Amino acid sequence: MTNTRKTHPLIKIINHSFIDLPTPSNISTWWNFGSLLGLCLAIQILTGLFLAMHYTSDTMTAFSSVTHICRDVNYGWLIRYTHANGASMFFICLFLHVGRGMYYGSYTYFETWNIGVILLLVVMATAFMGYVLPWGQMSFWGATVITNLLSAIPYIGMTLVEWIWGGFSVDKATLTRFFAFHFILPFIITALVMVHLLFLHETGSNNPSGLISDSDKIPFHPYYTIKDILGALLLILILMILVLFSPDLLGDPDNYTPANPLSTPPHIKPEWYFLFAYAILRSIPNKLGGVLALIFSILILMLFPLLHLSKQRSMMFRPLSQCMFWILVADLITLTWIGGQPVEYPYIIIGQLASILYFTIILLILPTVSLIENKLLKW
């Protein structure tokens, strides 16, 4: 008799996705981040659900309700800090996952890649709205500054901003709708993840060599389930060290001051994972130009399949492209640092140079270097 897992309509889907899935035999630890992102999403949804049970989305009580969670709810501090630092772990895994895709040419899976970019945008939107909820100083001013960027859109800009605010400034209506969206979006993310996996399983996974691996596949279970469990344990270990020893390491002290529309903090800055985009936004003096650069800094990822001019898929055997890739990584780290610095000399010029370099490497240098490598290999 055939095994139930292979015949049952529901279990069959799980079987084909996580058990009997044919997987390349040579995928490295860089392929662990997909499952780690799934784990992060599960942690965020669970901790978020328990936080939502005690949180109130009203300007008068939001800050107090978060304090109440930390002080009076059983293990509320643990849930709150796991949720806050879980977001940081989520973004670390996201950046490494995207970087892996760029390095090994996974973007040639067109649909999977584009859905991944959409996922990145939705996760960024969710994280931004979550940061507004504690209603501290940085929450309020962050929301004001970022939503105000939409006013750069010609003609309809200001109307659009006031429509999003639900009034003439960031207030109760804004907080309530942000909470509603912050609650619903993770479930939309989960649905998108399923579509992401659906398209991935149409083609099968890429591998470090970038070569077709149909002739050498192994079952996902037990080989990669055990590998994923190791990754998961390491992720939980790092997250717990962060939560239990220095929960506020990545946060902003200003957010422990209740929101006050009458006093602006000296330096308004978003969470660390948005700083690279924030630096690009600030490096252009023109408001609309800055907003366009900000949007394009993420959407540029969608151009990767079109900018791939190399005859090889992966960068594994392309030393020149590897050099440019790591310069790009260093550039992004520089942008992240600049995003957290005040707007003054020499930070302004460093930010502008790093922003120019970011777009130049992706749009010009990487494709050119690919063509040079083709020539060197007489392809």
Swiss-Prot record:
Entry-linked InterPro entries: Cyt_b/b6_C, Cyt_b/b6_C_sf, Cyt_b/b6_N, Cytb/b6-like_sf, Cytochrome_b, Cytochrome_b_C_euk/bac, Cytochrome_b_N_euk/bac, Di-haem_cyt_TM
Localization in the cell: Mitochondrion inner membrane
Keyword Metal-binding on entry: yes
Keywords from the UniProt entry: Electron transport, Heme, Iron, Membrane, Metal-binding, Mitochondrion, Mitochondrion inner membrane, Respiratory chain, Transmembrane, Transmembrane helix, Transport, Ubiquinone
Highest taxon above the source species: Eukaryota
Example GO molecular function: ubiquinol-cytochrome-c reductase activity
Cofactor(s) listed in the protein's UniProt record: heme b
TM region positions: 33-53, 77-98, 113-133, 178-198, 226-246, 288-308, 320-340, 347-367
Cofactor note as given: Binds 2 heme b groups non-covalently.
Binding site for heme b b562: H83, H182
Range of residues in the leader sequence: none
Binding site for a ubiquinone: H201
A GO cellular component entry from the record: mitochondrial inner membrane
Biological process annotations from GO: mitochondrial electron transport, ubiquinol to cytochrome c
Bilayer topology annotation: Multi-pass membrane protein
Ligand binding (heme b b566): H97, H196
Record bears the keyword Transmembrane: yes
Quaternary organization: The cytochrome bc1 complex contains 11 subunits: 3 respiratory subunits (MT-CYB, CYC1 and UQCRFS1), 2 core proteins (UQCRC1 and UQCRC2) and 6 low-molecular weight proteins (UQCRH/QCR6, UQCRB/QCR7, UQCRQ/QCR8, UQCR10/QCR9, UQCR11/QCR10 and a cleavage product of UQCRFS1). This cytochrome bc1 complex then forms a dimer.
Any further remark recorded for this protein: Heme 1 (or BL or b562) is low-potential and absorbs at about 562 nm, and heme 2 (or BH or b566) is high-potential and absorbs at about 566 nm.
Protein family: Belongs to the cytochrome b family.
PANTHER family assigned to the protein according to its UniProt record, in alphabetical order: CYTOCHROME B
Function: Component of the ubiquinol-cytochrome c reductase complex (complex III or cytochrome b-c1 complex) that is part of the mitochondrial respiratory chain. The b-c1 complex mediates electron transfer from ubiquinol to cytochrome c. Contributes to the generation of a proton gradient across the mitochondrial membrane that is then used for ATP synthesis.
Protein name per UniProt: Cytochrome b
